[in-house]
Amino acid sequence: AKDKEKKEKKDKKKDDAPAEEAPAAAAAPAEEAAPTPSAAPIHKVGNVFALFKQNQIQEFKEAFTMIDQDRDGIIGPDDLGNIFQQIGREVDPKVVKEMLAESAEKLNFTHFLTLFGEKLHGTDTEGTLRDAFALFDEDKLGYLLEEYVKDLLTNVGDQYNKDEIKQVWKEAPIEGGKFDYVKFVRLIKRGKEEE
């Protein structure tokens, strides 16, 4: 009975440990502390690994590795085409490229997990968020004036207080009074390391 209690305590500690990012390489991640599951959307978390339990991340990693047949850490058109052939489906290479186009860059493990996180947790895609900011960018410059964004946040829709704005502004890409919403969306969707 005591051994069972010790194991339960050990498992509980693992569940409470902070998430560590799994490597983007094809090898399975080393033993890591299990992330705390969260219902928070990716754009609030900034780290897709925090959305899943460790065993779920491992399952996604195994699926990624199975698809990444050339073991280069990237799922490319050839990898995806080969998987379709293995399951007996002939798919036009153009269709495969379109499927991969949803990922703005090369589809490494982090992006692969992000796509699943968006689908499973119902968060908006990078493009959707970027387009929402672009609605306010009438001149299509890729940035908004800092004071204009602050005014929108305090007076329109869900109104934010000064402390909430200060929190957002800590990480916001602002230079010379210009809020770069393209970089901001990338930051909230992929995290700081992939700016």
UniProtKB/Swiss-Prot annotation:
Extent of Basic and acidic residues compositional bias: 1-17
Molecular function as annotated in GO: calcium ion binding
EF-hand domain mapped to chain residues: 55-90, 124-159
Statement: the UniProt record of this protein carries the keyword Repressor: no
Low complexity composition bias: residue spans: 20-39
Keyword flag Cytoplasm: no
Effect annotated for changing T65A: In 20% of the molecules
Keywords of the record: Calcium, Metal-binding, Motor protein, Muscle protein, Myosin, Repeat
More about this protein: This chain binds calcium.
Function: Plays an important role in regulation of muscle cell contractile activity.
Name of the protein this chain belongs to: Myosin regulatory light chain, striated muscle, 25 kDa isoform
Species, as recorded: Lumbricus terrestris (Common earthworm)
